[in-house]
Amino acid sequence: MATKVITGKVRASFVHIFEPQSVNGSEPKYSCSFIIPKSDTETIGKIKAAIEEAKQNGVSKWGGKTPANLKLPLRDGDIERPDDPAYADAFFVNANSREKPGVVDRRRIPITDPLMVYSGCYVRASVTFYPFNTNGNRGIACGLQNVQLWCDGEPLNGRVRAEDEFDALDDVDDEDFLD
């Protein structure tokens, strides 16, 4: 049993929502990291409640009790990524899925262009939290369901859009260009 949460405005990072990606030879999955400002207490509260519910649902998978070394999906960017300013004063969750997530714009029109949703843009996300017990690893996983583009943001890869980097040029006569 999974518990669903729809986030508020979060920042997308490591966006792989249009094509699945394999990590270290594992099964290819769709994935995205969602950076949640610590000031968004509503989204953080919903995620914490969903994790607690998933823990209760997982007791049967974990031999009747919650393990002490349980892996949890809500992580603190200040602790785990102290050198990355995008994660400062924020929590994050890494969500993934074997199935392609739905991706829509603000008006719920499907987005198929992978350049529209990128690491650094702002989105809302539909994610689920569920218990797992695989190969001795126990914890709560975060499943990727759907993504809604909220607005553009500064790309996290450091790349600048061409239209932001260059000034418009006047029309040039080809003969003048060669001089």
Language-model regions, residue ranges each:
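OB-fold ssDNA-binding interfaces and closely related basic DNA-contact patches used
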Residues: 1-92
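Acidic, gly/ser/pro-rich intrinsically disordered tails
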Residues: 1-4, 154-179
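Extended Gly/Ser/Thr-rich low-complexity repeat segments
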Residues: 46-55, 102-110, 114-117
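Exposed beta-sheet edge/beta-hairpin loop segments within beta-rich domains
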Residues: 107-123, 130-140
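OB-fold/S1-family single-stranded nucleic acid-binding modules
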Residues: 135-154
